[in-house]
Every structure is written in structure tokens, then in C-alpha cells.
Amino acid sequence: MSNKLKVTLIKSMNGRLQAHQQCVRGLGLRRIHQSCEVQDTPENRGMINKVAYLLKVEEVL
């Protein structure tokens, strides 16, 4: 299992719950189609699962 994940914001945060916006910001994303790599930890997985409908997630090999 990879220890990094590539996370891409594919939908807008406008009109979303404040907690969901904070999760996206916590993952290091600000703009649509912006990507970043995060460590594969339970904390990050929890944030990703909470806002999965806004994101595209890939394992980095």
C-alpha cells in the first residue's frame, strides 16, 4: 500500500457545509483542479471520506 495519496478538487466548495470546506482546506486544496499529495494516514483518510463527492483520489506509486 502506498504511503501517499494524490488528491484533486473537482467540484466547487461554494454552498457546501462549513465543516466540509474546512476538510478540503485541511487537505491543502483551494481551487478547482488543484492537486496535492498527502500522507496516507487515518486522519487524512477521514477527511477524504467526508468530502469524497468533491474529490478525485489516486495512490502515488
UniProtKB/Swiss-Prot annotation:
UniProt xrefs under PANTHER family: LARGE RIBOSOMAL SUBUNIT PROTEIN UL30M, MITOCHONDRIAL RIBOSOMAL PROTEIN L30
GO cellular component: cytosolic large ribosomal subunit
Species in which this protein is naturally found: Dichelobacter nodosus (strain VCS1703A)
Gene3D superfamilies: Ribosomal protein L30, ferredoxin-like fold domain
Subunit (UniProt): Part of the 50S ribosomal subunit.
Keyword Cytoplasm: no
Keywords assigned by UniProt, alphabetized: Ribonucleoprotein, Ribosomal protein
Keyword check for Nucleus: no
Official protein name in the record: Large ribosomal subunit protein uL30
Molecular function terms, GO-annotated: structural constituent of ribosome
Pfam families membership: Ribosomal_L30 (PF00327)
Family classification: Belongs to the universal ribosomal protein uL30 family.
Gene Ontology process terms (BP): translation
UniProt-listed InterPro entries: Ribo_uL30_ferredoxin-like_sf (IPR036919), Ribosomal_uL30_bac-type (IPR005996), Ribosomal_uL30_ferredoxin-like (IPR016082)
